[in-house]
Amino acid sequence: MRIEEDLKLGFKDVLFRPKRSTLKSRSQLSLTRQFTFKHTQTQWQGVPVIAANMDTVGSFAMARTLAGFEMMTAVHKHYSLEQWQAFVNSTDPTLLGHVMVSTGTSEDDFTKTRQILAMSTALRFICVDVANGYSQHFVEFLRKIREACPNHVILAGNVVTGEMVEELILSGADIVKVGIGPGSVCTTRVKTGVGYPQLSAIIECADAAHGLGGQIVGDGGCTCPGDVAKAFGGGADFVMLGGMLAAHEECGGEVVDVDGTPFMKFYGMSSSSAMDKHAGGVADYRASEGKTVLLPYRGPVENTVRDILGGVRSTCTYVGASQLKELTKRTTFIRVREQENNVYGKE
């Protein structure tokens, strides 16, 4: 046993230090980035924000809407092959370039993923998603899918430390998903005592990935546009959002009427709700590591997206970054004990 004495930080522990800027307006600023991926040497250009591969967020409808903002959607793995075929047949190939096909690590998942990818050459991205990216089985599956899909960009996770980021990149991942326990409907840290404050995880994992020519996704922990900006400032190449995009028209979640007010059900993918729906219940050997909440129905997602992107643009102008790529180079975080004035309630 040993204890690491270094203090690890989350988004709530810091603020950006403002700096001189030559920008006259937020409208001068571009959030579009272009990436070249390590293993395929292919390129992608767009706004590097991804809707999470949760079945109450990463829907086909969400993918269609977010593609209009040049953003990405990691479509959840629970759609059938028939549903995928209908989506591909009715969707422009350009839009499919903003879609990730999500998969688990079972043999059935592997077979299904290859069948989906065969539907269109425009489906370029694979999201290999497990709660614990530290298992040897996960690494072996990653090598297997890299060998089977040499021309596809692979996103894999989740992990929170540099040495495992390096392991995944060397095993075939182009992008590594970073985050254990920070999500709004995740209870892993409570049930297991395992986790890592998200900002420190991003900073350390970005350093490891960039040294090998890979990228990272900051997955989880963002509660407001300022947190999204902090993730980018800490070195994340992409940011994945679940709760911030939940309870919208495009989510496809269950709408519940409470005293005449519509709410939408939102739950973690390791919650009892998810396991009841997709696995026939919580297995005897495990505990639920997610919760189920009712969120006020928020209508179309486009207004929320504009608010998020507008906040990140504003951050860039405050620190003098003329494009999103420059944000991490212009970032100085200050440690704080307060974030905002809540005398009249939270924003």
From Swiss-Prot:
Alphabetized Pfam families for the sequence: IMPDH
SMART domains the UniProt entry points to: IMPDH
EC number: 1.7.1.7
InterPro entries: Aldolase_TIM, GMP_reductase, GMPR, IMP_DH/GMP_Rdtase_CS, IMP_DH_GMPRt
Residues annotated as binding NADP(+): 108-131, 216-239
Keywords carried by this UniProt record: Metal-binding, NADP, Oxidoreductase, Potassium
First-tier enzyme category under EC: oxidoreductase
An example Gene Ontology molecular-function term: metal ion binding
Amino-acid positions noted as binding K(+) in the UniProt annotation, renumbered to this chain: G181, G183
Cellular component annotations (GO), alphabetically ordered: cytosol; GMP reductase complex
Active site: C186
Catalysed transformations (reactions): IMP + NH4(+) + NADP(+) = GMP + NADPH + 2 H(+)
SUPFAM superfamilies: Inosine monophosphate dehydrogenase (IMPDH)
One GO biological process term: purine nucleotide metabolic process
Homology family: Belongs to the IMPDH/GMPR family. GuaC type 1 subfamily.
PANTHER family: GMP REDUCTASE
Protein task: Catalyzes the irreversible NADPH-dependent deamination of GMP to IMP. It functions in the conversion of nucleobase, nucleoside and nucleotide derivatives of G to A nucleotides, and in maintaining the intracellular balance of A and G nucleotides.
Subunit and partners: Homotetramer.
Name of the protein: GMP reductase
